[in-house]
Amino acid sequence: MELSLSVRVAEQLSNKRNPAMSLETLAEIALSAGYKALCMRASQLGIQTPIDEVSQKRQWLESKGLEVSMVTGDFPIPENTNLAPNALKNIGPYLDLAEALGADLLRIGMKEEDDINWAQRACDEAAERSMRLAHQCHTASLFEKVSLSLEVIHKVNRENFGIIYEPANLVQCGEEYGKDAIKALAPHTFNVYLQNLKISTDGESISHTWNRGTIRFDQVTMWGGQGIDFPLIISILKETGYNGYLTLHQSATPPTPPEEFITKTSEYLSALL
């Protein structure tokens, strides 16, 4: 397993459109902290970005020795709005973006049963270009629960369709995120997102789930001993033979500055690998 840094770290928790730093600055921090790849989002490069600019950024990243682990090509997908599934209906520009960045994995969004058919079509188009599609474990989606996630994966029934295991969203949905969940999802896990939170009745952040209603929580650092059991997660991932990326997928947690947050998280996770 190798570490990847999501450009989300330079976004606000509630605003996923405006980056707090340039891609070049973020990449330099990632390199110095030991990350091997960036997980790209539309706040830096998306389907709205001219493809020539995307190609230039890729060349620069490659010159620094950084890969792109996965691509989220628009804003509705990370914002998890009802527009998130629209990418499945016109997957071509997203595949073009991923190809220009040298990535073979795209994150997509699904909200209802009808999206399964569109996912099949998108997967077939992606397969023609040796690319994969994956959905994150996420609130207010078809992937809130492990059991439902597996049902959807089996209905899509495409080898290039899988899941992004992400324990924090499972916690918000009241799901078990440890050994049983990881092993059940293992055959379909294309990527691993890691972020930390602590459920609290007076938490500063709010999440809306389908199966538990509104949840309040606080973002906390991974190294502070609160929230999710990351040593357990990584030990089980090792047991299952997962050898993909571990992606830091969390906005910098105040009052820790982004650079310090990125570096300390890398040090913490690297010690567990």
Where are these regions (language model features)?
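A structural motif
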Residues: 35, 100-103, 189, 242-243
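Active-site groove signature of glycoside hydrolases
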Residues: 97-114, 135, 248
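Acidic/histidine-rich catalytic cores of soluble enzymes
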Residues: 9-11, 37, 71, 124-227
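Conserved active-site loop/cleft motifs that coordinate metal ions or position small ligands
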Residues: 243-251
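H/E-rich (His + Asp/Glu) clusters that bind or coordinate divalent metals
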Residues: 222, 226, 233, 246
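Generic structural signal for well-ordered alpha-helices
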Residues: 23-30, 54-58, 91-95, 116-123, ...
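Acidic-and-aromatic substrate-binding clefts and catalytic sites of carbohydrate-active enzymes
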Residues: 12-20, 41-53, 76-86, 110-117, ...
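N-terminal pre-domain/capping segments
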Residues: 1-100, 131, 158, 266-273
